[in-house]
Amino acid sequence: MPLQTLAENEIIATLLALALLLLSAYSLGTLMEKIKAPRVVGEITGGILLGGTLLYRFFPDLMSGIFMAYEGEGKVLNIFCQMGLVFLMFLSGYNTKIEADRNNAKTIGLVFTGATILPMAAAVPFVSMFKGYFAGESGDIISFMLVFLIGIAITSIPVISKIFFDMGIMNTRFANTVLTVSTFQDLCLWILLNAATRIAEKGEVKLSDMLLVAGFTLGLFVLAKFVSMHAHKFRKKIPAITFFSVSFILLLTVCAVLSYFGINIMYAAFLVGYLVKSFVGDESGSDAKKRMDSLADFAFSFFVPVYFALVGIKLNLVNDFSLVRFVLFFALAFGLEGLGTLLFVSFTKLKRTTKINFAITMNARGGPGIVLATVAYSYKIINLEFFTVLILTTMLSSLIAGYWLRHVQKKDGSIFTEL
């Protein structure tokens, strides 16, 4: 079968572009970690510096010679970008635990309602105000509204987990509550995002179609949850090469097959990760856990940084950005989620500082916020300005959450263990 290949100079240009993306993402990511900030913020910033905000603005010929050296280089790089998204969601699915602590059920329910349902409902009147500035070429109001509302309420499990781990509070009641709520929240929001992309793709809105897509998407997760409850019976030791090969075959095949049924790659990869955990387990010290950790180390040192850097390189904070509209959206998103959480946790007997901690922590958008922006932009649901606003909102909210929690810990180290 004759397949078209890249010329040697095109391969070299692609490798150079990847190396520069990795170098920039690694350098800025490491810098952010040194100042106790989320690494993802640095990796995106590394991409921003390469793009129209700085280097491409002042050295267009040089940067074009690297990232646009031949026709179609952007498409080649986009493959690595998509693989970063796939592995990010695959690993997120593997690390997802849908288990509610019965002793803490009231707090979990109140935080979920205050951080998800209330802010999304309160944001509905603002959709029309921003639509004229933020809507994409698809022009579908329902898809845009769903993305807008998700952007208001989304929370990041990976970023929050990393912050908790670095602070040494990963197994506290506060951390467990936040992670449980974030898991349920992200599941609901992924379902809504999948519905939004499906509606945008079909170009028309029918209530029956919306219900069908939402039902099918939710049904897939229910099926995955059902399988996970019984899959442990079939666990057995398998060689590492078989483990990885079967996992990758399953991952790529399911992503391809489900796309024909209107399920986007992001959600499909999440489901596969969840299923793999069900069959192989995630017990600490087990062979499966060690293998997934090694896969995570590789993915988060190559594909994921490239993904975040390519997200950043698209941003142009000089031409495609309004500071006023960014401030308005950020204040709306941070304020509604924070106040909503604070309002509902006021019905508990938690300490005042703990209530504020929940309100600020649930605002950390991190990786899921980036995924939301890139998926919505790729389906033309949002334009470049809103894409930029969502990315910057994600970065700033994650920084605020991280620094706030460390500030509180310095004042009272026991605040997270005693709810």
Map each language-model feature to its residues.
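Membrane-interface alpha-helices at helix entry/exit sites of multi-pass transporters
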Residues: 104-110, 170-185, 205-210, 285-290, ...
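Transmembrane alpha-helices that form the ion-translocation and gating core
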Residues: 27-34, 98-167, 311-413
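Hydrophobic alpha-helical transmembrane segments in multi-pass integral membrane proteins
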Residues: 55-59, 120-128, 186-197, 251-265, ...
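Transmembrane alpha-helical segments of multi-pass membrane transport proteins and ion-pumping complexes
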Residues: 21-30, 48, 52, 56-57, ...
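Structural signature of hydrophobic alpha-helical transmembrane segments
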Residues: 7-20, 72-89, 139-155, 208-220, ...
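Membrane-interface helix termini and inter-helical loops of multi-pass transporters
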Residues: 2-7, 60-72, 130-139, 198-210, ...
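Cytoplasmic-side transmembrane-helix entry/capping segments in multi-pass membrane proteins
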Residues: 37-46, 103-118, 173-180, 235-246, ...
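Membrane-interface junctions of multi-pass transporters
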Residues: 50-103, 230-239, 246-328
